[in-house]
């Protein structure tokens, strides 16, 4: 399985028991969707390795307590500590309307109602308080806030995000 064909689910955060159980931090708004997984991909030495789940249940708000097959003690759990966890993209529920997954709009054109098409989305910066579209217009990199009421339409068919941005925001980059 290639990383490009997967989505980031979370990270193995800490050991839970001396029998190899671990807590996986789930980077999701709906952790209950992932309570009954049969397997996940764990990134070990830059390779996605399938890990089969013997048992799992939610632990507190954002953690999944997991017992993997063939991880039977603390030493084996240590070997996968802090590793990232992935699932195949096909496991994501389809979104419609103006709801979208960040990875889904990478490569889409971005258009403002007044200015027209002004670039292509190359990345999403979600390390800030407000996620940002990272847009490339020729050599110019632009940061456009991903605010719901700015988004007019996610046009999946034409691979375009249409926005109604505050006057001057796009122009300050051009």
From Swiss-Prot:
Subcellular location: Cytoplasm
Gene Ontology CC terms: cytoplasm; ribosome
Family: Belongs to the RimM family.
Gene3D superfamilies linked to this entry: PRC-barrel domain, RimM
Domain of life of the source: Bacteria
Entry keywords, A to Z: Chaperone, Cytoplasm, Ribosome biogenesis, rRNA processing
Gene Ontology terms, MF aspect: ribosome binding
One Pfam match: RimM
Summary of the function given for this chain in its UniProt record: An accessory protein needed during the final step in the assembly of 30S ribosomal subunit, possibly for assembly of the head region. Essential for efficient processing of 16S rRNA. May be needed both before and after RbfA during the maturation of 16S rRNA. It has affinity for free ribosomal 30S subunits but not for 70S ribosomes.
Name of this chain's protein: Ribosome maturation factor RimM
Domain text: The PRC barrel domain binds ribosomal protein uS19.
Name of encoding gene: rimM
Source lineage: Bacteria, Pseudomonadati, Bacteroidota, Flavobacteriia, Flavobacteriales
Subunit and interaction comment: Binds ribosomal protein uS19.
UniProt GO BP: ribosomal small subunit biogenesis; rRNA processing
Domain PRC barrel positions: 97-169
């Amino acid at each position: 399985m290639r990383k490009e064909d997967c989505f980031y689910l979370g990270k193995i955060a800490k050991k839970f028991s001396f029998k190899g159980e671990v807590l996986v931090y789930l980077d999701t708004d709906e952790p209950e969707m992932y309570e009954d997984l049969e397997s996940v991909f764990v990134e070990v030495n830059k390779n996605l390795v399938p890990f089969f789940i013997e048992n799992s249940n939610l632990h507190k708000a954002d953690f999944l307590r997991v017992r993997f097959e063939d991880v039977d003690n603390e030493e084996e759990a240590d070997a996968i500590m802090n590793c990232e966890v992935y699932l195949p993209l096909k496991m994501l529920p389809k979104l419609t309307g103006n709801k979208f997954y960040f990875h889904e709009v990478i490569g889409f054109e971005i258009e403002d109602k007044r200015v027209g098409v002004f670039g292509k989305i190359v990345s999403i910066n979600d390390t800030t308080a407000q996620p940002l579209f990272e847009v490339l217009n020729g050599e110019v990199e632009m940061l456009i806030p991903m605010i719901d009421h700015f988004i007019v339409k996610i046009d999946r068919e034409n691979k375009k995000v249409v926005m109604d941005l505050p006057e001057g925001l796009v122009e300050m980059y051009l």
